[in-house]
């Protein structure tokens, strides 16, 4: 019996830019499912067809693009939180078998691990978990230094909403 090949989807950073109280119910539900409950929160998701459909539905409330490993490592270092609102530290990562933030970020972007965060994890002897246990699945960011162009126009039209490709990394660095 042959082992099935796993599909490796690209990793996307999704940042919520609009926090309108009168958001339509279906959009609010999709933002909630993506765990984007407040303005300037970010999630990192795989580009599977179901997730991409959700992102397309909330395209007028978020900006998104491909995240690079060094940007993800920086986000984990500066904005990563574990349950109890404690900062994610290098000691905590080493406790679970990871040597650095960069190692986790590279493994996630390359598709070696499927998820960044998971709840309770029972480690087996000498085995590293396939995630960071108890990591919060979203990152709270600051408003961007230098401000935004427009949260009413799409990126291609000179605004900030929608798909922006690898340029999302510049925006995230301005928000750290």
Curated annotation (Swiss-Prot):
Gene Ontology MF terms in the entry: RNA binding; structural constituent of ribosome
Subunit structure, interactors included: Part of the 50S ribosomal subunit.
Family matches, as HAMAP family: Ribosomal_uL30_A
GO terms (BP aspect): maturation of LSU-rRNA from tricistronic rRNA transcript (SSU-rRNA, 5.8S rRNA, LSU-rRNA); translation
Protein name: Large ribosomal subunit protein uL30
GO-annotated cellular components: cytosolic large ribosomal subunit
Organism: Pyrobaculum arsenaticum (strain DSM 13514 / JCM 11321 / PZ6)
Alphabetical list of Pfam families matching this protein: Ribosomal_L30 (PF00327)
Protein family per UniProt: Belongs to the universal ribosomal protein uL30 family.
Gene: rpl30
Disulfide links within the chain: none
Record-linked NCBIfam families: PRK06049.1, uL30_arch
Keywords: Ribonucleoprotein, Ribosomal protein
InterPro entries: Ribo_uL30_ferredoxin-like_sf, Ribosomal_uL30, Ribosomal_uL30_arc, Ribosomal_uL30_euk_arc, Ribosomal_uL30_ferredoxin-like
